[in-house]
Amino acid sequence: MKLHRASHLLFAISVSAVTAGVAAEQFGISSREMPRISVVEPMRPFVMRAAQDIAGDMEKIFGARPEIVTGAAPEQNAIVLAKAGTGWENYAVESMPGNVLKITGSDDRGVMFGLYRFASDCLGVDPFYYWNGCEPKRAASREWKSISIRQGDPSFKFRAWFINDEDSLNGYHPETAGKRTIDYERYQVVFGPEVEEHICETAVRAGFNAIIAASYVDILNPDERKLVDVAVSRGLFQTFHHQEPCGVSGWIAKREWKLRGMQPVTYAEDPEFFHGLWRRYAEAWAKVPGVIWQIGLRGVGDRPYWVKADWHSADGWKSAEVPEEVERERAALISKAMNKQVEIITDALGHRPEHFATQLWLEGAQFFRKGYLKVPEGTCIIYADNSPGLKFGPDAGRQKRFATPAGLYYHLAVVHGNHYTQLVPPRRTHEIFSYMHEKGAKEIVIVNVSNVRPFGFTVTAAGEMMRDLGSFSAADYARRWASLRVGEGRAKGLADAIDAYFGAYELVDSRDDVSSYGAKTPRAKLALFNDGVLYARTDDILCEMEGGATDYVRIPSDIPTDDPDALTDAAKDAWHATTQDMSPYLKSRARSSERAYRQSAAFATVAARLRPYGTEFLHQARFLSIASRLYAAAAAGDWQGALWAARERDALDAEMCLGEEWRRWYDRHLIYPFRTLAARIEKIAELERGKQGKECEK
């Protein structure tokens, strides 16, 4: 039996990182005689789901599906699942005599993660295969000289995905989508349980054990409860956005005010209203296994609790200076609310919650830093980054070591920044995680993954480093990721090209300290390559031309509107560097179902050579390049140039749909709807031509 070269590379690297001097037996898989997957003792349902996943992986590779059996372990030709040892999610994957692979875990999740580790490191299955189309290579058989992988307690106990501002997911497979009941334009629908299945499978394959199943989940809405049930069935703990104490967001409160015919109230004005709402939702969430509770106090649309206006209003952003005594009073009220929430959760559960946390954000972080905010005993304090996933604020930076259980909230994607593109390099993420881990933030990491699909490279890397910070290497990870797509011989070339991609859009100087926002951050560059800011600034210009007011509070930007040439040149240079670095190393292998890029024959050639290996990076580089040109043209009043760029954006979206499966992916881009810009620009261009014609007549 012959070992597939890409899988061998993955296996060799992974095993060398976790074993030293451990002898193990040879193990092989052949389509002629598939090993059975043997579950020798009762396991929770999510372990059986994982076994089915691995059986499916083996069927894709070998053309035959292994049988899953229970009871006594076979002595020959089997993959045996059992529990052994102690610790949190520990596991071992070892080949034994008789062509047996034994996967043991200290608990059920340990067994599950051991299975998925075998799939990724030995079978070569990309955790994001569903989203990126990178399926494992077919083979009649494979053989490993030995397999011995051991994983102790993970570096971070809870490792959570946050599905946030998920406009693409909500438009994907609309036939299975459900209805929401909150008054929020972006969230009139919620993606269906079939989509959640793919999300949760990817999360556990990537090593995550917790999830915020969607933004603003309403557990009492059956369509949203289905998502929670799917996540639980996959072995994922449930947690919440920092706006959702006891599972209640400000949008739920706003709906309740309307249903009851009430005027909006703050917690200070009507605490009993909130107590009743928290109690009602805590009782529902108490029936869900594995909840990491959220406590805290924020207003509608993630505003301070004393602001009644929602996020649509500019008033919601105001942060006026107030006397110290006012800050102390506000902090005391938040502390009082948190203690009440713990009391309500305790009543709902019948015992004090085992896991509960509060996320420090804006005024919460400020009050805590000043010593005004007192949290209930046992609260895990979650510190937040600066949104682009690049630094942590002074509330974390000023502490040598955290005195309480601590964690971090980290953005690999962010709605007012890189919402559709990967811009945070794994190297930087590793620096941030290591910095926080050394201070004692080991309890939980919540990673914002937005719409999931665009972020496979960076999210998979985050999963690996959360498992074992000490052994993670960004360069090694990139090479292994590349080897799945192009093989060992070309892996370094693709890995170098990916490094060049991140370098072209580097947001923070490597000398910057991760502990604070700092003056050295190149703000203009940060604003330049950022899809959220580029859309917002372009939309501002169009609104001014249309004579309307902007309907969204704009993100501040340092891009000079009077120098569009500099913007265009920077985008052009970054795009050129990325494509030039990538193109020489990639095999020419384009699937018949994939369409080439339309901008020019040169781009079409590059795209064909990239697919299906580095397509996401090529797409995201072009996305940023065209968005930059669109803004530059609009700022210069070049409406024909802006129209060309807007149409190119539409074409780029269409090309990335990759067949019937993804044809609806961009249908509900409500947050930054680049697709709507072409029609608006066309009207403006027509008006401008009319004005010019009248001037010529004069």
PLM ranges: what are they?
Residues 222-225, 230-233, 264-403, 553, ...:
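Gly/Pro-rich turn-and-neighbor structural signature
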Residues 126-188, 194-214, 404-407:
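An acidic-aromatic substrate-binding cleft motif
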Residues 303, 402-426:
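Active-site clefts of carbohydrate-active enzymes
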Residues 8-18:
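Bacterial N-terminal signal peptides
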Residues 425-506:
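Substrate-binding cleft of secreted/luminal carbohydrate-active enzymes
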Residues 476-698:
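Catalytic domains of carbohydrate-active enzymes that cleave complex glycans
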Residues 23-153:
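Contiguous, structured surface segment used for ligand recognition
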